[in-house]
UniProtKB/Swiss-Prot annotation:
N6-acetyllysine, modified sites: 16
Main function: Binds double-stranded DNA tightly but without sequence specificity. Involved in DNA compaction.
Pfam families (UniProt xref): Alba
Stated name of the protein: DNA/RNA-binding protein Alba
Name of encoding gene: albA
Biological source species: Metallosphaera sedula (strain ATCC 51363 / DSM 5348 / JCM 9185 / NBRC 15509 / TH2)
Length: 98
């Protein structure tokens, strides 16, 4: 993802690492007092993003997290050989309950 703008401090980008790495990142942000965080993923990592939110919501902070919004979409990605393909994306916004 070179050439993109820097990610905001309340965003967790889900990729190829184990799910617990992203769970820890989300919990760290929530414990630092960030009011709302966004979990973003695309392609095959979408299921990891959903797993991340569910683990935070059910195992670590039960009854303390609410899902604010879920956005799905697609991006056009150009491969190294010049072909374009669409990749699905997801953004899940969560926050601590008041």
């Amino acid at each position: 993802m070179s050439g993109t703008s820097p990610t905001p401090s309340n965003v967790v980008l889900v990729g190829k690492k184990p799910v617990m790495n992203y769970v820890l990142a989300a919990l760290t942000l929530l414990n630092q007092g960030v009011p709302e965080i966004i979990i973003k993923a695309r392609g095959r990592a979408i299921s990891k993003a959903v797993d991340t939110v569910e683990i935070v919501r059910n195992r670590f902070l039960p009854d303390k997290i609410e899902i604010r919004a879920i956005g799905v979409g697609s991006q056009v990605v150009t491969s190294q050989d010049g072909r374009q393909s669409r990749v699905s994306t997801i953004e899940i916004s969560i926050k601590k309950k008041a």
